[in-house]
């Protein structure tokens, strides 16, 4: 690693307190939804709290000693690993005799139009179809390929990364949970790279766990690539599950898939499901992850599997393989085996820093379902009913109502769930994603990228960057997130700059310091944006609250003589909550990580409390001659609409009508403006993309396929980004999120099509005036210096 002999004083050379003296135990399961699991695996009973480097293999990891063993340690270690048993030999017969498949054979399901009569299909033909579908789902494991690829992967990982870190206490917790529960185990992991599906099984096997079956996306890989992955333990959703519900092959594929998963769990094999889309940039549930989790949930609901142990996992890279070029990559084209090998080899030549893998506290799926079903509310409204009146300026939003999840009319799931079960499964997905993200360690590259992108866009001295790095790391640890690094501050920061060498330029100054300037090219801004997105979950509630305050300042600005007077503006607590709730309802729950057991009121309350704890908001007593930002319509907001049910401290019996009139103002401390801007900028890329998507509505002349609309919107965002170098807003994932939000809001309507849904502009937003109102509504939350 290249270093610079710069004398920055002794204060920054010491190991600061957050590096080694305090590391939070992250990833606790929800005490409300799974209280028994929360007690069973409490971390105070764990004895091992250190870390281990999984890819550091020596003769100590083998049963032998000697100079030859030291040279063959990787090979001998892999030979000692115990891989999981293969699926039962009679799997096909057991699936054929399962109730689901027998219902189809005996004509207990409806026939599809144009299909051959079911009675004319022989048993041999049924077995042949089941065999073909099973071949699309999985293949027999190859012990030779498993050991060969594990040995090669260990070699590559040592070339690509400095270390791959696991927490020993989390491993002990997981071993105890698996042994105590004695039920099937399903790992629900975050997803950062295509390497994850090979890396995580290797880590689990190396620590004495059975190798899990890994879920992969069928359409993302070529046939030869899929064949190799299935022999290594990969499983796929057969393509026929997406066919219309009355198609014979679609019905049979769904029945075979559901029966296969039940047999997999009953045979006590592990399953690894990725909850996120790779390279998404924001926490976002993947479609395939939902399907696999729905299958696990359905196996429990039918009673065929008594219980499942859910283990959320967090995965963090300094630099993920393939991340740099993922922005321009065409994800619609299947990846060949050669493309994947080329990506891995390129990463091995570059050096990508470190990896940290964390296991959250396991919990019982049966316990979660029982507790959540008891508390589940049937009331709720769609986003269009909740927020559209406020967007159009007609009346305030009813903040006391829960938002119903949007479901596309063109989608067909792998398993049929009723509305109550679907809601319960969606809540499980959100809970698991939130836990997986919260237990993911924050890497040094993400911290440095966020500082360069959101705070020091014009450049910063290395000494100041180190001070800000220390400050931001302490803030992360105070929010009960862990960091994936340790050591002297100078060494850590210089290491991150070496990994970000394509994104920054360094200039030695005559004063003995170094100027670090982020590049403004598309590749540099895109990479910094993707790295800095790791900090959004840490500060998401404060970011939502800061953007809500920014919206109130925008409303107040026309009534003031100059922007300088905004520092003395006073906000009424009720209006702060209203504006925060508007943004909370607008954004998807998986992005803002609002757990299903948290009401909108509770989420807004925590956001305001955190801003007060950070010192950004201070309480203020308002006199009659002071200007307070209380723009609420009094006939609709005579008292708070929320009923606090998230804790005893928020009991409705303690509600005081005057509490809603408590006032706050922005702090006048020196660094508060910078912190406020930093928090607003974390949500800036998403909000700015949404605003530009509104401007793009003018180009939607007629119904067109959603994929075509997405591509045109992405090209529009790229053109806008070229004008002001805002390439962090030209992300395809953010464009897709914007389209989903506007479909929920009633801006875009869906029409069914043969190749997919068609989008057209709703009648309400065909009017230019309503488009301008929507743009103004989004723009109020955006920090203006980032516009």
Region roles according to the model:
Residues 1-787:
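Membrane-interfacial terminal anchoring regions of lipid-handling membrane enzymes
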């Amino acid at each position: 690693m290249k270093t610079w002999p710069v004398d920055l004083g002794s204060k920054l050379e010491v190991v600061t307190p957050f590096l080694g003296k305090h590391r939070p135990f992250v990833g606790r399961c929800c005490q409300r939804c799974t209280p028994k699991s929360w007690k069973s695996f409490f971390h105070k009973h764990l004895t091992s709290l250190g870390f281990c480097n999984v890819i550091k293999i020596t003769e100590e990891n083998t049963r032998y000693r000697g100079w030859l063993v030291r040279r063959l340690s990787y090979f001998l270690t892999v030979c000692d690993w115990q891989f999981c048993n293969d699926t039962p030999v009679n799997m096909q017969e057991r699936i054929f005799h399962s109730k689901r498949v027998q219902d189809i054979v005996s004509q207990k399901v409806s026939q599809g139009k144009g299909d051959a009569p079911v009675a004319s299909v022989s048993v041999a033909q049924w077995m042949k179809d089941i065999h073909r579908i099973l071949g699309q789902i999985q293949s027999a494991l190859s012990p030779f390929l498993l050991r060969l690829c594990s040995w090669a992967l260990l070699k590559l990982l040592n070339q690509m990364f400095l270390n791959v870190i696991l927490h020993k206490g989390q491993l002990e917790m997981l071993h105890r949970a698996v042994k105590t529960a004695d039920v099937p185990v399903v790992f629900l992991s975050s997803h950062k790279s295509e390497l994850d599906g090979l890396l995580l099984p290797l880590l689990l096997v190396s620590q004495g766990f059975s190798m899990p079956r890994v879920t992969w996306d069928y359409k993302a890989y070529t046939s030869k690539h899929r064949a190799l992955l299935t022999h290594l333990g990969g499983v796929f959703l057969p393509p026929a599950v997406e066919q219309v519900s009355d198609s014979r092959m679609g019905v049979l594929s769904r029945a075979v898939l559901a029966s296969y998963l039940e047999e997999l769990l009953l045979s006590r094999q592990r399953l690894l499901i990725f909850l996120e889309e790779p390279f998404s940039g924001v926490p976002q549930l993947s479609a395939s992850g939902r399907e696999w989790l729905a299958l696990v949930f359905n196996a429990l609901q039918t009673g065929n599997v008594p219980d499942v142990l859910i283990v959320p996992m967090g995965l963090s890279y300094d630099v993920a393989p393939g991340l740099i070029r993922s922005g321009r990559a065409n994800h619609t084209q299947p990846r060949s085996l050669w493309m994947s090998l080329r990506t891995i080899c390129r990463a091995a030549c570059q050096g990508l820093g470190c990896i940290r893998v964390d296991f959250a506290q396991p919990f019982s799926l049966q316990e979660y379902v029982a507790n959540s079903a008891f508390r589940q509310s049937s009331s709720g409204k769609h986003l269009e009913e909740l927020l559209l009146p406020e967007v159009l300026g007609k009346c305030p939003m009813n903040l006391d109502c829960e938002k119903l999840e949007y479901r596309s009319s063109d989608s067909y799931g792998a398993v049929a769930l009723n509305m109550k079960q679907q809601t319960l499964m969606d809540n499980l997905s959100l809970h698991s994603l939130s836990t997986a993200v919260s237990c993911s360690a924050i890497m040094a590259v993400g911290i440095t990228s966020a500082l360069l992108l959101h705070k020091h866009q014009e450049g910063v001295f290395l000494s100041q960057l180190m001070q800000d790095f220390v400050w931001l790391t302490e803030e992360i640890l105070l929010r009960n997130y862990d960091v994936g690094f340790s050591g002297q501050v100078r060494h850590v920061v210089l290491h991150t700059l070496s990994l970000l060498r394509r994104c920054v330029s360094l200039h030695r100054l005559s004063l003995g310091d170094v100027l670090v300037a982020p590049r403004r090219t598309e590749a540099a801004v895109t990479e910094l944006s993707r790295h800095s997105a790791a900090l959004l979950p840490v500060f998401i509630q404060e970011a939502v609250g800061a953007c809500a305050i920014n919206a109130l300042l925008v409303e107040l600005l026309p009534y003031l003589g100059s922007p300088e007077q905004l520092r003395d503006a006073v906000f009424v607590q009720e209006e702060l909550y209203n504006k925060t709730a508007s943004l909370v309802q607008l954004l998807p729950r998986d992005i803002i990580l609002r757990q299903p057991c948290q009401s909108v009121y509770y989420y807004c309350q925590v956001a305001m409390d955190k801003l007060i704890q950070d010192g950004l908001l201070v309480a203020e007593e308002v006199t009659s001659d002071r200007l307070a930002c209380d723009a609420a319509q009094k006939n609709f907001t005579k008292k708070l609409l929320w009923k606090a049910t998230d804790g005893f401290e928020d009991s409705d019996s303690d509600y005081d009508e005057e509490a809603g009139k408590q006032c706050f103002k922005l702090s006048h401390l020196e660094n508060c403006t910078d912190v406020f801007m930093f928090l607003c900028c974390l949500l800036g890329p998403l909000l700015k993309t949404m605003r530009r998507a509104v401007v793009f509505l003018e180009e939607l002349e007629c119904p067109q396929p959603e994929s075509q609309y997405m591509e045109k919107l992405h090209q529009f965002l790229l053109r806008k980004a070229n004008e002001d170098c805002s390439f962090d807003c030209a992300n395809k994932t953010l464009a897709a999120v914007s389209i989903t939000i506007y479909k929920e809001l009633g801006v875009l309507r869906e029409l069914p099509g043969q190749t997919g849904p068609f989008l057209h502009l709703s009648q309400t937003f065909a009017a230019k005036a309503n488009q301008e109102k929507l743009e103004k509504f989004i723009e109020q939350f955006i920090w203006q210096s980032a516009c």
